[in-house]
Amino acid sequence: KHTKVLIIGSGPAGYTAAVYAARAMLNPILVHGMEPGGQLTTTTDVENYPGFAKVIQGPWLMDQMKDQAKAVGTEMIEDHISSVNFKSKPFEAIGESGKKYTADSIIISTGAQARWLNLESEKKFRGFGVSACATCDGFFFKEKTVAVVGGGNAAVEEAMFLTKFASKVKLIHRRDKLRAEKMLQKKLMDNKKIEIIWDSVVEEIIGDDDPKNVKGLKIKNVKNNKTSDLKIDGLFIAIGHDPATKLFKDQLKMDNEGYLITKPDSTETNVPGIFAAGDVKDKIFRQAVTAAGMGCMAALEAEKYLAG
């Protein structure tokens, strides 16, 4: 299948790119996996997407974006891209289905996944007191006690952000010192609402089934192997994200964490005609609205590129 614009990945970035590309009469094809919509499909309440005064649901918002992209003329294909060749034109992408897609330009919006602890109890309470995004969900924990797992910049920033809402924040770290930058560490130590629990890991999340909510944690001290219970109302996992870029390893420039590198103030990668939008290239903001904005930029830049 040949197209002027091939969009790999859905979510706010992919769908917005599709809307703009379709309205520019570029007849885009968007290839998405089994469960399209990206990370927003795993969150429940969304309160920070512009244009909605009432709380909306993440999956609903993604369905709306998908329907909008379809309505303006995007062709959606369910397939999993397993290999690409960006070294010659037209660009090539091969799906697990065996289908071959060729394109004059490509927008990559494959996103990222939060790293999880991989506990059964974590899966159970994800979206019901367990989250990987303080910016998204901190607001729901006004005057409550929450815990954050991690020891890097992200964990420290999440912990400090959560003190705006929570009455107490416990930062759980498996080592005896943090990896975060010194400046951040100082701010953290100065914050009276934050308590650090060193040398510890979360073994289990404890809570109720009906309605689903988190009540506490079982934590283990890795030095003496003692377990203890901790009463909390919410848990935030901040141990990093993994961008979905393995596919592009020898084709596109990435940073040491695997995020695609784009030119300043642009979504263009080091290969002209290949653009990247959303969490696949953004490790700073990671919001639906910024991803959508980048999707728009990528489509406009692709249009300009195709016009020569």
Annotate each language-model stretch with its function.
Residues 2-4, 78, 142-144, 199, ...:
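Phosphate-coordination loops involved in phosphoryl transfer and adenosine-cofactor binding
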Residues 3-72, 156-182, 255:
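Beta1-alpha1 glycine-rich phosphate/pyrophosphate-binding loop at the start
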Residues 4, 27, 129, 144-145:
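Residues that mark the start of a beta-strand
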Residues 11-12, 35, 112-114, 153-154, ...:
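Residue-level detector of alpha-helix initiation sites
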Residues 69-95, 100-103, 164-264, 304-308:
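A Rossmann-like FAD-binding core segment of flavoenzymes
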Residues 76-96, 100-139:
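Glycine/small-residue-rich loop that forms an oxyanion/phosphate-binding "nest" at active or ligand-binding sites
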Residues 118, 123-140, 239-285, 294-297, ...:
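FAD-site-proximal beta/loop scaffold in flavoenzymes
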